[in-house]
């Protein structure tokens, strides 16, 4: 392979790495837990990370227990799990 071809390949690999989303290995483990409203009967807007869709979604949190995949704002969810 010519040096020009190697440089092109190296450039493409570098670009691909930069455009690839964050690996699931880089996310906290709790980002992969399903949303859990908990047993209480509150009605609080919350957000959780959906690993298949690779985005944060809204759900209604009951106000107690649940799991750590539970954020008060979508920005907090994105910073923690989708960044």
Curated annotation (Swiss-Prot):
Keywords: Disulfide bond, Protease inhibitor, Secreted, Serine protease inhibitor, Signal, Toxin. Disulfide bonds join 31-81, 40-64, 56-77. The keyword Transferase does not apply. Its main location: secreted. Pfam families: Kunitz_BPTI (PF00014). This is Kunitz-type serine protease inhibitor mulgin-5. InterPro entries: Kunitz_BPTI (IPR002223), Kunitz_BPTI_sf (IPR036880), Prtase_inh_Kunz-CS (IPR020901), TFPI/VKTCI-like (IPR050098). Expressed by the venom gland. Residues 31-81 form the BPTI/Kunitz inhibitor domain. GO terms for cellular component: extracellular space. It comes from Pseudechis australis. Residues 1-24 form the signal peptide. The keyword Signal applies. The record marks 41-42 as: Reactive bond for trypsin. It is found in: Secreted.
